[in-house]
Each structure stands twice: as structure tokens, then as C-alpha cells.
Amino acid sequence: MKLLLAGGGTGGHLFPAVALAQRLLEQDSEAQVQFVGTARGIEARVLPEQGWPLELIDIRGFVNQGLLGKLRMIPCLIRSVWQGLCILRKFQPDVVLGVGGYASAPMLVAARLKRIPTVIHEQNAWPGLTNRLLGPWARCVCLSFSEAERAFHRAATIVTGNPLRKGMEGCPPMDGDAPELLVFGGSRGARAINDAMLEALPRLEPWKDRLRIVHQTGGDDLQRIREGYARAGWPQESVVPFIDDMAAAYARAHLVVCRAGATTLAELAACGRAAILIPYPHAAADHQTVNARAMAKKGAGLVLAQQNLTPETLASLITDLLENRPRLISMSAAAKSLGITGAADRILRVCRNVCGQD
């Protein structure tokens, strides 16, 4: 099978696509994979480093722009679809899988024009506008959350789960060692979380000799946050711009402070880790809040709205959970119960089915 994976922008869209590509090549060494993204997305750095073929198209978001901005985007959208048609002509895929992100829409439209079967993978509990509009065009929409089915009443859907990076599904249970706190704001970091965590450090002083903090800051805030840790007397060696081996980071963690992107929640569930979830408030259709509430409803996490994010509140929640081991274990078990394994296999089965190779 020749599979074209379109999308990216953030790790939440990209990493499931990479997991799919890896699984496809494990199943069939003769299969071919082509990624399509943008120069501004995380894929422009990560995919070449990992040796994956990547084509770039010129497209940017327009959902949050005003009327004039949307009108100016029309020529850009037309150009990106044309670029997509050229990529399809060169690669000639059996199926195009849109994984979300700016590059996904033009490639799905181009594939529709070329009558190439399309599949969409929607990671969130409430889909973005692009996937809601393009869903009826796709042969199938694969969902990570069953709650998303209500948004695709005119499309064929299947709940597949979210493909995970290597090592996630084999994550060991939480151990009894000295507690470790994992803090991150997605693949690019999150300034609000970085700042709140930095200011919460003095309030975590009683834990200084017992608690290890691993903090992914993103590149922009790295030096500032490291200096803040040093001033507060906390080790700064584990303050890093990006964590390459997230499976190992989850395995060591007892509690996680993070955003509520769909891929993050799928990884928390697969690894069985309790979390303080701080949804990104400007996500399309506020989908991270919907994601977080779905997790919290099952007892697997606590939701802390960014508007309520203060150093005092964050430190209090961290302390309460670390001091209440039975509750931490219960939340971790609840998270583990939500994990859906084998998502990559299910999505690839759908792709083979729509292009007549199953």
C-alpha cells in the first residue's frame, strides 16, 4: 500500500501519523509512505531527522482570522490545493489519510479531485471545523473518542483510538520510588504552564528533597525557566526544551501536569498516569476542554482552567495528589482503563479496506 499522511503542525497531529507509518512498514516492508506538511510545523524538523520523506505545501490557518483575512487566504488555499495535486501526481498514493493540521485540508481536497480514497483521523472529542466539513467527503472517519461521533452524522465513522509512539503501550505500572512530576505543555511548550510552575516552586519547598521534576519547556522559554529553577534552589538538569523519549518520561512519572490535547490524553491512558489537565483555551472549538472533561468524568484527571491557573492553585493540587497515594493510584488505574490499544492496526485496516487491499 502507498499511504500519504497529510497534516501535522503540532506533535498531537504528527506523532500518531508517525506511529501509523512505523506500523505499516512493520506489517509490510514493501509499503511506501509519504508525509505532507508545512515549513512552520514541527514535522519540518522531526521528520527529516527520523528519515521520513516529507513534501511541504504553503498553507496557514484561517479559522481565527477576520473576514478580510479569510478573503486573502483564498488564493493561498487554491495554491496549496494545486501543490497537493502535484504531489499526488508524483507519489500516486492508494489512499490519503488526513491527520489534522493545516496541510490536511488541501491534500484531502486534492485527493477528492483526483478521486483517490480519503480517510480522516480525528483525535479530539470535539472535531475542528475542517474535519467536520470534509468528513462527509471521506470514505471513513476514524475517531479517538466516541463522543466525536455526534459531529459526523453524515459520515461513516469508526472508533479506533489514537496511535501511540513506540513504548507507550508497554509502560510499566507506577512504582513506589520517590515521586517524580512530569510537566509539559505540548511539543512547543506552554508559557502559562511554564510560568505557573516556576512560581509554584517556592510553595513546593517541603518536597524539594523528595520530588524530582522533569519539565519540558519548549525552546523559547528554556533559558528563563532554567534560571528560575536555579534561583529557587531546584535542579535544572531535568528542565529541557523537548523530550525525545516520552515513553520513558511517562514510565518514571507519578503525576503529570500538561495540556489536554488528544494525543497527550491517549498517552496518559496507555501509560496509566494521573494528570492535572490545563486545556489550551484558544484551541479550535475549545476542544481541549472537551477532551479534558471526558477524562475527568472517568476519574482519570483533574481539570484546571487556564483562567484559574495560579501558582497557589497548582502547588496545592500537586501537593494534595502526591500526599494522597491511594487517590493517585485510583486516578492512574482510571486512566489505564481508558486506554485503547491497537489503534494503528485498526486505522490501517480501514485504509486497506477503502482502497480495496483488505
Curated annotation (Swiss-Prot):
InterPro entries in the cross-refs: GlcNAc_MurG, Glyco_trans_28_C, GlycoTrans_28_N
Pathway the protein acts in: Cell wall biogenesis; peptidoglycan biosynthesis
Main location: membrane
Compartments where located: Cell inner membrane
Residues reported to bind UDP-N-acetyl-alpha-D-glucosamine: T10, G11, G12, N124, R165, S187, I243, Q288
EC number: 2.4.1.227
Reactions catalysed, as given in the entry: di-trans,octa-cis-undecaprenyl diphospho-N-acetyl-alpha-D-muramoyl-L-alanyl-D-glutamyl-meso-2,6-diaminopimeloyl-D-alanyl-D-alanine + UDP-N-acetyl-alpha-D-glucosamine = di-trans,octa-cis-undecaprenyl diphospho-[N-acetyl-alpha-D-glucosaminyl-(1->4)]-N-acetyl-alpha-D-muramoyl-L-alanyl-D-glutamyl-meso-2,6-diaminopimeloyl-D-alanyl-D-alanine + UDP + H(+)
Catalytic class of the enzyme: transferase
Keywords: Cell cycle, Cell division, Cell inner membrane, Cell membrane, Cell shape, Cell wall biogenesis/degradation, Glycosyltransferase, Membrane, Peptidoglycan synthesis, Transferase
GO MF term (any one): undecaprenyldiphospho-muramoylpentapeptide beta-N-acetylglucosaminyltransferase activity
GO biological process, one term: peptidoglycan biosynthetic process
One Pfam family cited in the UniProt record for this chain: Glyco_tran_28_C
GO cellular component, one term: plasma membrane
Domain of life assignment: Bacteria
Membrane topology type: Peripheral membrane protein
Protein purpose: Cell wall formation. Catalyzes the transfer of a GlcNAc subunit on undecaprenyl-pyrophosphoryl-MurNAc-pentapeptide (lipid intermediate I) to form undecaprenyl-pyrophosphoryl-MurNAc-(pentapeptide)GlcNAc (lipid intermediate II).
Stored PANTHER family: GLYCOSYLTRANSFERASE (PTHR21015:SF22), UDP-N-ACETYLGLUCOSAMINE--N-ACETYLMURAMYL-(PENTAPEPTIDE) PYROPHOSPHORYL-UNDECAPRENOL N-ACETYLGLUCOSAMINE TRANSFERASE 1 (PTHR21015)
Family affiliation: Belongs to the glycosyltransferase 28 family. MurG subfamily.
Name this protein carries in UniProt: UDP-N-acetylglucosamine--N-acetylmuramyl-(pentapeptide) pyrophosphoryl-undecaprenol N-acetylglucosamine transferase
GN (gene name): murG
